[in-house]
Amino acid sequence: MNLPRAERPRSTPQRSLRDSDGEDGKIDVLGEEEDEDEVEDEEEEARQQFLEQSLQPGLQVARWGGVALPREHIEGGGGPSDPSEFGTKFRAPPRSAAASEDARQPAKPPYSYIALITMAILQNPHKRLTLSGICAFISGRFPYYRRKFPAWQNSIRHNLSLNDCFVKIPREPGHPGKGNYWSLDPASQDMFDNGSFLRRRKRFKRHQLTPGAHLPHPFPLPAAHAALHNPHPGPLLGAPAPPQPVPGAYPNTAPGRCPYALLHPHPLRYLLLSAPVYAGAPKKAEGADLATPAPFPCCSPHLVLSLGRRARVWRRHREADASLSALRVLCKGSGERVQGLRRVCPRPRGATATCSSDHQACCIPKPLPLCCKCPPPLLLGQFCSNSSSIRRTAPTAALPPRARCWAGTCRPRRRC
């Protein structure tokens, strides 16, 4: 009679058992495997609860494609059952700060730096601005340039210096401040097509004055002096016309004035020297040129007419731009070299006086050797200053020897 087998605790493993027939029995190990699976499940649940509490309450973190999923998806099989539900509950990772800043940055304006500078200058009532004023206008008008301020400020400075369409205006002494003003060249106002700043016609270049170009005189010339400088001299009875503007000069300049005053190439006042200076002149001054004498205010109409005839004859034998040549005079008594200049005037009809009495302001200079006893005067034309007073004087015989010498009546002892 077989007795019922007492159940042993599962914790103790069953070793080899023998039945009544003496055969070995099978070992029961299923109970141990179930216990191990339960322990692993409990450990995994504890780990998941810990992660859930540390990260976010109510969500179960699982590594499925690197995306956080709700707990019900993990418990239901690990994957989303409904695609629409997955799309609604899916949360994309946050973007970086740089990407968000690029998305909010405004677009760059389609204008060149020259167009931006032109806009800033034209909107000013005085049509001029400093560099800081131009940069302030651009940054206030276009938000794109508010962030990259140092970079485009250097570009503005280079465009102001390298383009001829912008003119630098120095700051006036009575206006304190820093930096010069910048304005537009008046000839560059049409460099944009139809006033649109999007397209420029061509690069503006300021006209350069040629070296041989004659600039207008800074002051109007008298009629007699203009006859000497005119390439086609004629009767000039009235005031000379205002000089024509030179191409490339500023159009806003008033007639008779130029932006930079230039004197005659050889002013007479620099060549009128005293007698000792003439006596001590070096030998290299023998071929030096003398300038055209400065005009004198005493000129009558008939003398101007005769001057035109004499000037035409004079210019046939001389070049238009040639100056007068000096003479070399060797005086026998002193042995010094003296440069002299004699004025020969056209003698009007009925005039009996010599050159000293009829000498006018518009005389044509002509070189003539001087006599040995008569030193040159301190100033040329000192006997020709006033024609009205000289005509009332005595004839040539009553004049002093020096005056008669310069008038041409005395004959030198020996021609040098």
Swiss-Prot record:
CDD domains cross-referenced by the UniProt entry: FH_FOXD4-like
DNA-binding residues (ranges): 108-202
Gene responsible for this protein: FOXD4L5
Designated name of the protein: Forkhead box protein D4-like 5
Composition bias, Basic and acidic residues: 1-29
Family matches, as Gene3D superfamilies: Winged helix-like DNA-binding domain superfamily/Winged helix DNA-binding domain (1.10.10.10)
Region (Disordered), start-end ranges: 1-55, 70-105
Pfam family, any one: Forkhead
A GO BP annotation: regulation of transcription by RNA polymerase II
The keyword Coiled coil is annotated on this UniProt entry: no
Biased composition (Acidic residues): 30-45
Keywords: DNA-binding, Nucleus, Transcription, Transcription regulation
A GO CC term attached to the entry: chromatin
Subcellular localization: Nucleus
PANTHER family listed in its UniProt record: FORKHEAD BOX PROTEIN, FORKHEAD BOX PROTEIN D4-LIKE 3-RELATED
GO MF annotation: an example: DNA-binding transcription factor activity, RNA polymerase II-specific
